[in-house]
A protein has these predicted regions:
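ASCE RecA-like P-loop NTPase motor cores
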Residues: 1-304
């Protein structure tokens, strides 16, 4: 399996995988090689199981879930706040540089993969960075957040909100599950902490934070998750099934849209995903992709003949 990994751009069929074997073998490989790895399961539940496996086998701080950003389906148009936060956290992780040997893992599924995301440059422009010791007027920070769609409230309780009490500035980024508390001394950031919403108690201290808005609300170039990830290794249970699901969702949404020409601003297609994976390593449990048949096979587990 390591030899297959060392050959860039290969399509590798993993045969005779049973149970949680993929998680175990993949985790062992990732721990040795590092890098960015995107796992595409057949549905949300399978992706969640895979996520939990990697939480147990690797550093869970480097493992991210990438769900859809809508409740039930994009077809119904009802945004899911938790899904948006998880997607944004994964994108933020993909933007960070890694040292040699470090890794990050993204677990997703067809409906989530189908949704386009903002491009890295747009995300960088819309992100507000604050670190301890910065000279920053509170009014300037308020203006930056208001321009990014944040709402001022008395107490923050969900992403996209901020509050101000004297020199204490609370803000809830879309890339975090807990809000930040910035303590100002005059126009200097004196400390930054995460805190619990229910108790208001500090969870941990931070030296620097990125405050990310709801990226779905911004216009601009939108690309596939695979394009955003850049150089990565892709793991599919059944690549043809995933790409067919993506195209099926695209056709369903297209039938509901008043402006069909806008479909490409919301969803990718089979063709786009194949283009964005070109030249990247692909591991698969089923050799189902006619556009990219396996050029190597690895047998990891064997069963006794009946």
């Amino acid at each position: 399996m390591r030899r297959a990994y060392d050959s860039a751009g290969r399509t590798v069929l993993l045969r005779d995988m049973v149970g949680g074997a993929l998680s175990v073998y993949a985790a062992a490989l990732i721990a040795r090689t590092g890098g960015t790895h995107v796992f595409v399961a057949e549905d949300r539940d399978a992706a969640a199981y895979l996520l939990n496996d990697f939480y147990a086998l690797l550093d869970e701080k480097q493992v991210y879930f990438f769900p859809g950003s809508y409740k039930r389906s994009i077809v119904y148009g009802t945004e899911d706040a938790q899904g948006v936060v998880q997607r944004t956290a994964a994108l933020s992780a993909l933007r960070r540089e890694m040292a040699a040997g470090e890794y990050r893992i993204i677990c997703t599924y067809p409906e989530a993969l189908a949704e386009r995301v903002t491009d890295p440059d747009s995300m960088r422009r819309e992100t507000v960075r604050v670190k301890v010791g910065d000279r920053l007027a509170i009014g300037e920070l308020e203006e930056l957040l208001a321009d990014s769609g944040f709402t001022k409230v008395d107490f923050v309780y969900e992403p996209g909100q901020y509050s101000l009490r004297g020199g204490i500035f609370d803000v809830f980024s879309f890339s975090e599950s807990k809000p930040y508390r910035l303590d100002f001394f005059g126009e200097e950031v004196d400390s930054i902490r995460r805190f619990e919403i229910s108790s208001q108690l500090s969870a941990d201290r931070l030296n620097e934070v990125e405050i990310v808005p709801n990226l779905n609300s911004f216009a601009g170039d939108r690309i596939s998750l695979l394009a955003f990830a850049g150089e990565a290794t892709y793991w599919f249970f059944d690549p043809d099934y995933v790409l067919r699901r993506v195209n099926d969702l695209r056709r369903k949404v297209l039938g509901e849209m008043e402006e069909p020409a806008e479909i490409d601003t919301h969803l990718v297609s089979r063709k786009v995903l194949l283009q964005d994976m070109a030249g990247m390593r692909l591991f698969e449990l089923r050799d189902s992709l006619k556009e990219r048949p396996a050029d190597a096979t690895v047998c990891l587990l064997y069963t006794s003949p009946s």
